[in-house]
């Protein structure tokens, strides 16, 4: 389950990304012209929505129906070895559907939305060039928008960043979050008060650009022809599904997986260490929580995260929302895709 919030900050795009891991994404640039046909040819299909709502299952069904390939848009499934806690589909569960941008970074690599954008667009362009349909699938809202929309990333200033990080280390995130709330209430509402790294980035962008951080979010003008299908459930059944999912993760070995990743530097990973489930287990391993407390806090934190995901996605009127509990989910999703592709 991704804990990189739905409005994660734009990061600098200069960091090198390892070439290995997962399924290779061919290099490329620009938007390729589709070489083949199909009813959704030339259209990027995004499957979005909150954690545990059923995005992965729907994406597999759509990929089979549309001759598609999945491009991951879950910020934590980018990390190698973070499998159980992110509900990453196994090879068998992918049912032969090619998946791109899984397992590309070590857990010590800080997230970069700019690097993700570059890699994801290369994957999308390659899929389109082969006449197939790209399915952009995940609950990391900014990652989805950074691919689908025209989005230039603000620069960085090492001196400004260092000064803000020094303030964070000395005073903690609360006064910085209060400053952000005064300068940009919308940004403050989307960033948790304890998430110092994202608060620092937002304040840095405001200082460098003289504009609200939210002004740096994607321009809604499209980069690709696309359709966004959102899947969701009523709160009560989704809350129950989250609890069952966390129970299953514990049974499947989340503690052992986290312990193995801790040996690879997970606790020092600025992004990966904040992933839901993993951060709670790390606290258990450090003696800060009992295992029962870590388990229950994972459920509570995931439910809170789902509320923020909903708030992010529901602001976008272009998303066609579907009830993932409905018996006609796949047929309804295909109708939405076909209508947009006409």
From Swiss-Prot:
In this chain, the stretch annotated as Interaction with substrate tRNA covers 74-77
Tell me one GO molecular function of this protein. Answer: ATP binding
- Indicate, by first and last residue, each region the UniProt record lists as having compositional bias (Gly residues): 19-30
As recorded in UniProt, its EC number(s) are 2.5.1.75
Which reaction(s) are listed as its catalytic activity? adenosine(37) in tRNA + dimethylallyl diphosphate = N(6)-dimethylallyladenosine(37) in tRNA + diphosphate
Q: Where, in this chain's numbering, is ATP bound? A: 49-56
Which residues are listed for substrate binding in this entry?
51-56
User: What keywords is this UniProt entry annotated with?
Assistant: ATP-binding, Magnesium, Nucleotide-binding, Transferase, tRNA processing
Q: Which cofactor does it need?
A: Mg(2+)
Enumerate the Pfam families for this protein.
IPPT
Q: Does the keyword tRNA processing apply?
A: yes
| Superkingdom of source | Bacteria
Site residues, Interaction with substrate tRNA: 140, 161
UniProt GO BP: tRNA modification
Q: Where is this region: Disordered?
A: 1-30
Give the protein's function.
Answer: Catalyzes the transfer of a dimethylallyl group onto the adenine at position 37 in tRNAs that read codons beginning with uridine, leading to the formation of N6-(dimethylallyl)adenosine (i(6)A).
What is known about its subunit structure?
A: Monomer.
In the record, the note on similarity to other proteins reads:
Belongs to the IPP transferase family.
- This protein is called tRNA dimethylallyltransferase
> What is the native source organism of this protein?
Salinispora arenicola (strain CNS-205)
């Amino acid at each position: 389950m991704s804990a990189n919030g739905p409005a994660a900050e734009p990061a600098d795009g200069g960091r090198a990304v390892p070439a290995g891991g997962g399924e290779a994404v061919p290099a490329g640039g620009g938007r390729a012209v589709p070489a083949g046909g199909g009813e959704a040819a030339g259209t990027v299909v995004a499957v979005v929505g909150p954690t545990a709502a059923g995005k992965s299952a729907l994406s597999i069904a759509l990929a089979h129906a549309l001759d598609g390939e999945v491009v991951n848009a879950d910020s934590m499934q980018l990390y190698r070895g973070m499998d159980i806690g992110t509900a990453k589909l196994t090879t068998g569960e992918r049912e032969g559907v090619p998946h791109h941008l899984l397992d590309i970074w070590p857990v010590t690599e800080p997230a970069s939305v700019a690097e993700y954008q570059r890699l994801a667009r290369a994957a999308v362009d390659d899929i389109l060039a082969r006449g197939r349909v790209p399915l952009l699938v995940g609950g990391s809202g900014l990652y989805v928008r950074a691919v689908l929309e025209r989005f230039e990333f603000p620069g960085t200033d090492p001196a400004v960043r260092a000064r803000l990080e020094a303030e964070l280390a000395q005073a903690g995130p609360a006064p910085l979050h209060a400053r952000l709330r005064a300068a940009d209430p919308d940004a403050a509402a989307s960033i948790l008060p304890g998430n110092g790294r994202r608060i620092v980035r937002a304040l840095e962008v405001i200082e460098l650009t003289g504009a609200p951080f939210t002004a740096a979010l994607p321009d809604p003008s499209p980069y690709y022809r696309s359709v966004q299908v959102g899947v969701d459930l009523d709160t009560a059944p989704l809350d129950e599904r989250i609890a069952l999912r966390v129970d299953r993760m514990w049974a499947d070995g989340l503690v052992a997986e986290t312990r193995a990743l801790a040996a690879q530097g997970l606790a020092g990973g600025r992004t990966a260490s904040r992933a839901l489930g993993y951060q709670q287990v790390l606290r258990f391993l450090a003696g800060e929580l009992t295992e029962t407390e870590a388990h229950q806090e994972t459920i509570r934190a995931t439910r809170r995260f789902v509320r923020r995901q909903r708030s992010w996605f529901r602001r976008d009127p272009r998303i066609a929302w579907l009830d993932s509990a409905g018996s006609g989910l796949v047929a309804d999703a295909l109708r939405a895709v076909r209508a947009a592709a006409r």
